[in-house]
Amino acid sequence: MLKSNNASKTATCKVGDKAAKKVFFRRRKGCPLSVPNAPVIDYKNPELLIKFVSEGGRMLPSRITNVCAKKQRKLNNAIKIARILALLPFVFQAK
């Protein structure tokens, strides 16, 4: 009896939460690397690559950087090559 009572409470809470939420859709900005005069993605350009790496040294996902899928793949490959050639560190040290 307690299980059904708890289950009905959670079901009503979920419905109430959905009705109370307001959904806002924001228009995504375009890819910053697909615009005219955008910098070329190259493993020899660590200043560009460091913008797409987190403070801990991890590659940032495209949903955060707003980079299109094609450029994201090129970025990931360039970052990996730059790490192997010691142009970028694998892990950033905490200061």
Swiss-Prot record:
InterPro entries in alphabetical order: Ribosomal_bS18 (IPR001648), Ribosomal_bS18_CS (IPR018275), Ribosomal_bS18_sf (IPR036870)
Cross-referenced Pfam families: Ribosomal_S18
One GO term (biological process): translation
Similarity remark: Belongs to the bacterial ribosomal protein bS18 family.
Gene Ontology MF terms in the entry: small ribosomal subunit rRNA binding; structural constituent of ribosome
Any Gene Ontology CC annotation: cytosolic small ribosomal subunit
Gene that specifies this protein: rpsR
UniProt-listed PROSITE patterns: RIBOSOMAL_S18 (PS00057)
NCBIfam families on file: S18 (TIGR00165)
Subunit annotation: Part of the 30S ribosomal subunit. Forms a tight heterodimer with protein bS6.
Family annotation (Gene3D superfamilies): Ribosomal protein S18 (4.10.640.10)
Function text: Binds as a heterodimer with protein bS6 to the central domain of the 16S rRNA, where it helps stabilize the platform of the 30S subunit.
Keywords: Ribonucleoprotein, Ribosomal protein, RNA-binding, rRNA-binding
Protein name as annotated: Small ribosomal subunit protein bS18
SUPFAM superfamilies hit by this protein: Ribosomal protein S18
